[in-house]
Every structure is written in C-alpha cells, then in structure tokens.
Amino acid sequence: MSGTIATPRALLSLLVAASLVVAGVAQADDAGIGPQDIKRQALSSAVVEMAYSPTQRALFVSAPDWKEEARSRVLRLDPNTLAVKAEIPLKVKGFGVALDDAGNRLYLTQGFNGEVGVVDTATNHALGSIKLLDKVVLEQAYKQAGISGKRLDFLLAELKKFKITEDYQYRIREIKYDSHTGRLFLPGLGFGVDSVLYVVDTRAGKLEKVIPGFGYNAVGITLDEKGRRVFVSNMQGQLITLNADTLEIAATHEVQADQLLNLVYDPASNRLLGVDQGIDRDGYRNHHLGRDYVKRSSGHRVFALDADSGKVLASELTDEVPIGLLLDYRSQRLYVANRKGVRVEHGAGTLTVFDAKTLKRLQTVDLPPHPNSLALDPHGNALFVTVKNDGAGTKAGKPESVVRIQLQDK
C-alpha cells in the first residue's frame, strides 16, 4: 500500500477486501432474511473472494494457504449445497477474482507474487499466470522516483523495521474483466509510491500497459462497460475515471469520502455505490502526501455518487469497517459486509441491507466473525458471503466459511 510497509499478513486487510467459524446461524434484526434462509459451510484455512458462473452453475472461491503456499487452491462449490465439487491447485496464493464466463476463465490476483493467475472453469485446471512486475530494491526505487527528505527517512525506517530490502513495488488487490475488449484492469497499490493501474490483454496473455496517476492507495474499481469507463477510487478521497478503450485518464474528482475501498456501478441511475472504510491511516497517508490530509467523512458509511461528477447523492451509516458490497440490480437491494473491527479477538461482523435507490437501511444480519466478500446467483436468487476468522478462530486453527443466503422475491 502506498507509503505503508507491513508484513504480508497485515497487508491482507487491503488485499482481500480485499473478507465463521462461530457456531450457529446468523440472526436478522427484522423481517427479510431469517435464520431459515442461511446456510453456512466451513471450507478452508482461508477464503477470500468468489465468482458465480451461470455457465458452469458453480461458485468459485479463492482459498489461499498462508502456512503452505503450495496448498493454495480455488474451490468449486455447488451453489445450492455449498458442497466442494472440485479443488483446483494453485502454485501461489490467489485473492481477488474476475470471471470471463463466456471464455471459461477465472482470473485471480496473486498480490504477493506480482502475477495474475488463470484457471479454466470448464476443466477445473490452473493454466499458469501472467506476469505484471518484478521485485525491486525498494530503497533504490524510492530514490529513482525522486523521494527524499522526511518521506524517504520514514520509508527507510519502515523497511528496516520489517527487514525488507527487495519486494514488489505494487500490491495487486482487486481485478475487473471487460468483456468488450478482453482486458483486465488491476489497481496496483503503491508500496511507498503513487499507485498505478495495470492493464492485461487476456487474448494475448500478457501485460498491455501500466498507467500512472492513481494517487495514494488505489483500491476500489468498477466498470461501466456500456459507457466504456473504468472507475478507480483511492485512499485520499479521489475518484479517477479512465476511458476503457483509449486507456487515458478522463477525470480525477475530489469526493467527500476518504476511503472508498470497494465500488459498484449502477447503470440504471448512472451512480457509483461505495463503502468508506473508516480505518485510521492518517500517519501513513500524511507522510505519503507530505501534508496533513483533512478528513471529509466520518467513515463506516455507504455512499452514492454521481458517476459523471463524483458529487454525493446520498450517504448513510453502515456498521464499522465495511469491506465488500454487492448491488442486486433486479431487486435494487445493496448488500454490505461489515467486519466491525480489525484484528480483534472476537469478531461480531454483520451484513447490512439497504434500499439501493434511497440508501435506507432495511436490515442487519449478524454474520460473525468477519464477513468479507459477496457474490450473487441470480438464477437461484441466492447471496453468498465469505466469512473470515477473528483472532480466536485463527489461533484455534478453525476453517473459514462461505455462507449462502436464500433471498426472497421482492
């Protein structure tokens, strides 16, 4: 992350977006989702992001292994029962996912290896990876980038603290697939430098371009495929719009949300919906910017922005530390996964449900310890949530889970 040096486990808070082990079913605060609608399945030592394939009628889940990397895999689940139908071995850890369903390809960010993994969803085989970047000597890279003075001293102290000399200068967290061009778009979180956007040509199987100019900690990304726009948010209150065809930055807007971690685009209303995470990262951000950043939001909120201008159309509180969000276009429901704490011993995370048009909160569902990412099966009208361990669950070696929620017709 930009201006931040940390251990791989600490960086996972951004890479997984970047995600239960407690017995029992989730409880709903009001009518809507009830205990009878919820099924939970413990699966692996770690689960991160998911993609539902209508073609395969399967749910694909990234399952990295922190203790033994070669045990990392993609799980293929039955979307009705959550039974594991196939395990697809990976050589390295995979995190964020993007699906090319027509081409039977699943792409995974391999954030600690500088690559994008490729999986054949029809045959359940890994097809290798696409290289994005090499390791560099970070001190040399900082000096070559013109970093000096207090900012350089701060970064070098962080390198010394964590005993880092060589590393990847950018971390890859999220990934989006453009079906019109076959391109992948991947924000690269700058490791002490401004972030970039990686563009991969999947038809050629190679990196096409690296685009600079994405500021401190570029994290959120979504596409307007019909309008040919890519939207990227960062952790300094900016929304950057890229032309999806020319790959030129069309606009950079200052917005009234400091940490838009994840975004979705609503084509029906030309709005961007995003979660403002609310985690304290003032020190790192101020060092990176060389000034005191003035906060614009209380955090822990859901925002609706005009996609053309970045103007706030609506904003409502959600629960603490929102991570993933998903828009059900048919029902106009917005689902938000809230961690309710970072690195806590006992997690009490929730799923909040909003009316997507007004952002009125409709329901809160307990999904402890830490709900993370979301996927939707529109055919079966089912919502899926990955739920990650808290401190106690990790120490006990409990597996992380996927939850299936049967949604009701609106």
Q: What do these predicted ranges mean?
A:
Residues 5, 21-410:
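Predominantly soluble domains enriched in secretory-pathway, periplasmic, or organellar proteins
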Residues 2-14:
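Bacterial N-terminal signal peptides that target proteins for export
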Residues 13-23:
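Bacterial N-terminal signal peptides
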